[in-house]
Swiss-Prot record:
Pfam families: Thymidylat_synt
Gene3D superfamilies cross-referenced by the UniProt entry: Thymidylate synthase/dCMP hydroxymethylase domain
Pathway connected to this protein: Pyrimidine metabolism; dTTP biosynthesis
The protein, known as: Thymidylate synthase
Annotated compartments: Cytoplasm
Protein family: Belongs to the thymidylate synthase family. Bacterial-type ThyA subfamily.
Organism: Nitrosomonas europaea (strain ATCC 19718 / CIP 103999 / KCTC 2705 / NBRC 14298)
Primary enzyme class: transferase
GO (cellular component) term, any one: cytosol
GO biological process: dTMP biosynthetic process; dTTP biosynthetic process; methylation
Amino acid sequence: MYQYLDLMRHVLQYGHKKSDRTGTGTLSVFGYQMRFDLQTGFPLVTTKKCHVKSIIHELLWFLRGETNIDYLKRNGVSIWDEWADENGDLGPIYGHQWRSWAASDGTVIDQISQVIQQIKETPDSRRMIVSAWNVGDLDKMKLAPCHVLFQFYVADGRLSCQLYQRSADIFLGVPFNIASYSLLTLMIAQCCDLQPGEFVHTFGDAHLYLNHLEQARLQLEREPRALPAMQLNSTVRNIFDFGYEDFTLHDYDPYPPIKAPVAV
């Protein structure tokens, strides 16, 4: 995954030193894009080991519309622990907005079901968009959405997805984001009888925290290995029927993990 390493290299070379909400400080660039052909392998970073179990369970948690970390804790996933309140609640974050967006007339919109219906019925539509950025709910969220909006595109029997991410923790978060939205694209493509196309990742503020710079440089010393393959249970045709056991990752041969502190 040279695209990811190129992003880190770009930020180390051209990044602006900035303060941030967490008080850690960052090297930051504004506006950057990566593209991944999902036909050539599953874009999971190989220059450090990624916790695939967390990636899959987090995505399933979003798709369930849940915003309490109980499901994650029961499945050994701790990536949201730092933000949850004493009851495990996170407020109306991703899962709520994806599945239960509250409209001004009092109706509730399931954006995931809606966008899948659009892909099936009007694949040339330019409105196949899911948004997590609900301005009226931001103050109720424990963490405002970083991956804000994604759009689907169908051409030549292939489904592509573009994500706009307003804020990107390059070292810790971005490998998860790439894999998560690529996996979501594979799942929706299967449910819509399409082949996977591209995952396009567009950033607003892409940054390396100042206490991640040495880890980033270590990762840049490692030569990327061949991408793994992600196999989905081909019998699943409803996006909400997928379970953890329906995913099998083949030929993942990463370098050892690199630890880094989370900026909260």
